[in-house]
Amino acid sequence: MNGEGISDGLSAERKVEIRVRKNGRKDKVIVEKSAAQGLPEGWIKKLEITNRSGRKTRRDPFFIDPKSEYIFQSFKDASRYVETGNIGHYARKLKESDIEDDDSGNGKTVLRLEYVDKRSADDVLEKEKTIDDVRRSKRRNLSSSDEHSKNCKMTSDLSIVTSQVLEDLGKKEEVKDPIEKQLIAKRVTRSQTKASTTEEVVVDLKRNLSSSNAKSEKDSVNSSVRSQKPKKEAVMKEEEEQDSSEKRITRSKVEEKKNELSNSVARRTSKRLAGIELEPTPELKTRAKVQRIVPLDDEPTPELKTRTKVQRVVPPDDEPTPELKTRTKIQRIVPPDDEPTLELKTRTKVQRILPPDDELTPELKSRTKVQRIVPPDDELTPEFKTRTKVQQRIPPDDGRAGKCKQPVNHVTTSGSKKTEIPLNKEVAQSCNEQSSQKPHAAAATSNNRVSADSAVGIQNIGKAVGRKPSKDKKTLKSPLIVYELNPVFHLDGYKQKEEMSPVSPLSCQTSATKCEKTAAGKRVGRSSPKANLTTSVKPTQISPLRSPNKGKQPHPSDSGSAIQRRNKLANEYSNSSVVRGTCSEVMEKSTNSFSSAFDSTLADLCKDPCIAFAIKTLTGESLCLLNTPAISSNPINNHTKQKGVSFTPETPGNVNTCSEKLVFPSPPPGANIWQDPCIDFAIKTLTGAIPIGLDEPDTKSKSQGMTSTTAATQEAKGRQNNCDYMTNKTVGKPDDLRFTQSFSKD
C-alpha cells in the first residue's frame, strides 16, 4: 500500500482480503476506503466488514492520518488528536497492524499478505533449521570420546555460524519493523545460551575422559570458555528477571479478577437461606423468673414469700388447700423485724393468735376446722363467719336461758356467796334467788359463764388486760377476755402493789389518781394509795336493779363518810338511766363495773370513723348497732345516750360520786366480730394502745386455787378503786369533742 493511491482515490474503494489464522482457518474480509468526513483533508476512513457464523455482519471503522500514519479506532480519538495532538491509548501506526491478535479471544494471528515480505519469513525459517541441525550434531558428538577434536571444531564452527547469522539478520532487520527484530533476537539468544551450556558440559567431559590431551588444546578451550562465561551469565539474569516480572504481572491480574468477582457476587444476609446453623438459645424456666423477682440483698416481703412457696409446692392448675395456706401464713407471712401492715392482718389471723410453740385452744381448733371444711376458692361471707363463731362460743344449755352471766369475780367470804348481773329487771329476781348457791356450783358453771361473757363482750371495744394465754387445757377451755371502758387505752402509771396479786386480774388496775381539770379529762397525777380506802362503792349499792331485799351492807374496808356518800348517790340516781363516766380513761376490772363498760365502750369506739372503716375493711360488713341513737350537734349530748347505757357529763360539784344503771340488751348481729383478733389488732394500731387481756385465762386459773378470804379482800379493793376513779374523772370542758363522729349503719 502506497501513500499515492490513498491520496488520489477519494471515491470509495472496495477490496476483498483473505486472512489466514494460525489454526488454518481463513476469514474473508471486505475493506472499503473513503474520505473521512468531519476531519481535515487527507484523512482516510477504512471500514472492515466481516461475516461471522451465527452473527451479523461486523463493521469496524478506522481513521488513518496520512502524515503520521497513525490509525485511530474511533472518530472521537481522531478528532481529539487533531485538536490537542494527544494520541491516546488505542492509536497505532500502519505497519504495526501487519500482525495483531484477534479480538475474538482465540489467540489467533492474522497475516495480511499485502504487507508481509516473503523473503524475510523464509530466511527466518532457514536459520531455525540450521540451529536445530547444530544441536543434533552436538548430541551425536557427545557419544564418543574419540571424536573430541571434532566436537571442538564443531563448537568453533557453531559459534562462527551463529555470529554470521546474527550479523545477517541485523542488516536485514534494519529496514523492517523493530518488533520483528526483538522477536528474532530473543529466539537467537535462547538458542545461543543452550549451545553454551552444552559446551560447558562438553568441556567437563573432556577433562574426565581424555586426560592425555595436549596442553595447548586445553589452554585454547579454557580460554574460549572463560571469555564466554560473563556474557552468558548476564544474559541468563536478564531473562530470569523478565520472566519473573511477567509472572508477577499475570498473578496480580488474576488476583484482581478474583477480587472483582468476589465483590460483585451477591451474598445472602439471612443465615437460614445460607444454611448456617443458628446458635442454641437458652430456654426460659419458671424458677428462673421467680428468682429474678425476689430481691437479693433485702428480705422478701410476706406477700412475695407466700406466692413463691405456693408456686413451687402446688401445681399451677390446682388451687392450694386451706391447710397449705395456713402453713404458709404461719411460716412466712410476718417479717422478722417489721410490724405487718393492715393489709396483711386478715392473712395472719392464726399466726397472731397462736405462738408457734403454744398449743391451740379449743376456740382456735374450731376455727381451723371451719376453714378446712369450707372450699378454698369461695370466700366465707360475713354471715357465715358470724354463724360459725356464734356456734363456737354459745355454751351448752344448762336450763338458764334468758340470762347472760358475766364472769364475776364474786366476793367469797365465809359463805362464798356468788353474785350475777341479770340482763333486765325481770330476770333480777331469779338471779337473786340463785345467788345463794354453794361455791362448788359457781366453779361448775365457770366455763359456761366464760363463754357467755365472750358472747356478750364481743359487742364492746376495749383493751384486753392480762398476760399470755395459759397452756393448761384442763383448767381452761376458752380464753376469758375482759374489756375496759376506756376509749383512750392508756394504763401507764396506775398500777399499785396490789395489782400483782395472782388472785384476779380484775383487781390489778389503777387506783384513784390526782387529776386536774383539763380538756378532755386528761390525767396529770399519780394514784394515791390512801384514796383506795376512802372512796369505794359496792356493786349492790350502785346498781338500781338490785333487789331491795338484800339491803345495804357496809363493806369491811369502807369508812363512815364513804358509806354515807355512796348511799346518797344511790338515792339520787335510782330513777334515772344515766351513768356518769363519759370520756373516762380506765375502768377497774371488777365484774360489776365491766358489765356496763362493754356497752359504753362499744358505743364510744363505733363513733370513730377510723375504727369503723377498719371493721368494714376486715370483715366486709359494717357494724350495725341496735338501739344506738343518732348523734346530735350538741357535743355534750353526743355522749349521753349510747346503746342502752347513757352517760352524763360530770360537774366539779359532783366529784367523788358514783352511780350506774346496768341495762343489758340482747347482743347485736355483728357483735361476734369483736372477738376477732384482727379487729383487736386494728383497734390497737389506730388508737396507739397496747393490747391487754390475753392473760385473763392464766390469772383466772390461778385465782381458782386461792383462798376465799384473799379473793374477798382483793375484790373489795378493786370495787373501791373502780368507783373512786369514776367519781374523780370528769367530762372536761364543754368544747371537748372526743368521738363525736357518727357511725352510719351502711
Swiss-Prot record:
S-adenosyl-L-methionine found in the keyword field: no
Keywords: DNA-binding, Nucleus, Repeat, Transcription, Transcription regulation
Record field: compositional bias (Polar residues): 190-199, 427-451, 529-546, 702-730
Subcellular location: Nucleus
GO MF entries: methyl-CpG binding
Span of domain MBD: 29-104
Region listing for Disordered, in residue ranges: 131-157, 169-283, 295-328, 348-479, 518-562, 696-746
GO cellular component, one term: nucleus
Origin: domain of life: Eukaryota
Basic and acidic residues bias locations: 169-180, 244-260, 732-746
Biased composition (Basic residues): 465-476
Database matches in InterPro entries: MBD13-like, Methyl_CpG_DNA-bd
Keyword match Nucleus: yes
Classification via PROSITE patterns: MBD
Motif (Nuclear localization signal): 13-20, 44-51, 256-263
Recorded domain comment: The methyl-CpG-binding domain (MBD) functions both in binding to methylated DNA and in protein interactions.
Biological function: Probable transcriptional regulator.
PANTHER family the record matches: METHYL-CPG-BINDING DOMAIN-CONTAINING PROTEIN 13, OS04G0193200 PROTEIN
Protein's recorded name: Methyl-CpG-binding domain-containing protein 13
Organism encoding this protein: Arabidopsis thaliana
Lineage summary: Eukaryota, Viridiplantae, Streptophyta, Embryophyta, Tracheophyta
